[in-house]
Amino acid sequence: MSSGNSSLGIIVGIDDSPAAQVAVRWAARDAELRKIPLTLVHAVSPEVATWLEVPLPPGVLRWQQDHGRHLIDDALKVVEQASLRAGPPTVHSEIVPAAAVPTLVDMSKDAVLMVVGCLGSGRWPGRLLGSVSSGLLRHAHCPVVIIHDEDSVMPHPQQAPVLVGVDGSSASELATAIAFDEASRRNVDLVALHAWSDVDVSEWPGIDWPATQSMAEQVLAERLAGWQERYPNVAITRVVVRDQPARQLVQRSEEAQLVVVGSRGRGGYAGMLVGSVGETVAQLARTPVIVARESLT
């Protein structure tokens, strides 16, 4: 998969949440692997939602700008520390006086990837995705990476495979392209998972399960054949299971360094912004998740 000529490269949205620091580190390493720029963005909303019409004193706006510059400086240090062998990527930074979601959605038109933490500084107890990450999953013009605020518990996560969900949809085809590209750049294996039952049909009578399994395995092999030729250096493990895709992807994410899913699966309908599988995996997988949104421009 080509990284294209998107001028902003990889964009990472930053705030003072724990997940933002992890997001910066992941984005910096991915930008280094791709040899493309990294853009750090901190959005400062000039308005505060309140039922009282109280004007903000000038000191608050100045504090917001100073706080944003402090966050950018901290993020730049993370980028330097995250560097692998090739050296840190070219970094641009912006403090934008506007709401985060519309700002990042608009900037995503010129990005290869959009990277954000799962929960921002306005996190609510019990929530799994924040308003910014949820908004980008539905409206971004490029693939979105959701980062959780903890590092992998695996002893050698850099050696773990990339996991991709394959279901035959157009979004799944984009996810497959991204997954092969990431596995190739990271020099790791790829696990391609096809879970072919969104509902529990184990008790349905008259279904020839061995024949259905064999057919699903053949379909998966055909879906991957062209990509194997394009990326001969990537070793592939094909997994076909009779189970719900989201459950399998979340379970198997514990042994992967990255999960890639389509924004809408084969059950998605016209106008659907993000599918249930993509959203569930983004919420529950503890490893970074790329939701392969297609460009809307």
UniProtKB/Swiss-Prot annotation:
Source organism, top-level taxon: Bacteria
Chain residues that bind ATP 2: G165, D198, G262, S263, R264, G265, R266, G267, G268, S276, V277, G278
Gene3D superfamilies, per the entry: HUPs (3.40.50.620)
Keyword Nucleotide-binding applies: yes
CDD domains named among the record's database cross-references: USP_Rv2623_repeat1, USP_Rv2623_repeat2
Disruption phenotype: The deletion strain is hypervirulent compared to the wild-type strain in infection studies with outbred Hartley guinea pigs and with C3H/HeJ mice but not with C57BL/6 mice. No phenotype when grown in culture upon disruption, probably due to functional redundancy among paralogs.
UniProt KW keywords: ATP-binding, Nucleotide-binding, Virulence
GO cellular component, one term: plasma membrane
Pfam hit, one: Usp
Any one GO biological process: regulation of growth
Effect of D15E: Reduces ATP-binding; M.tuberculosis overexpressing this protein grows normally
UniProt binding sites for ATP 1: G13, A43, G117, C118, L119, G120, S121, G122, R123, R127, S131, V132
Keyword Protein transport: no
GO MF term list: ATP binding
Coiled-coil positions: none
Further remark: Was identified as a high-confidence drug target.
Role according to the record: May play a role in the establishment of a persistent infection (latency) in the host, as strains without this gene are hypervirulent.
Family that this chain belongs to: Belongs to the universal stress protein A family.
Protein name: Universal stress protein Rv2623
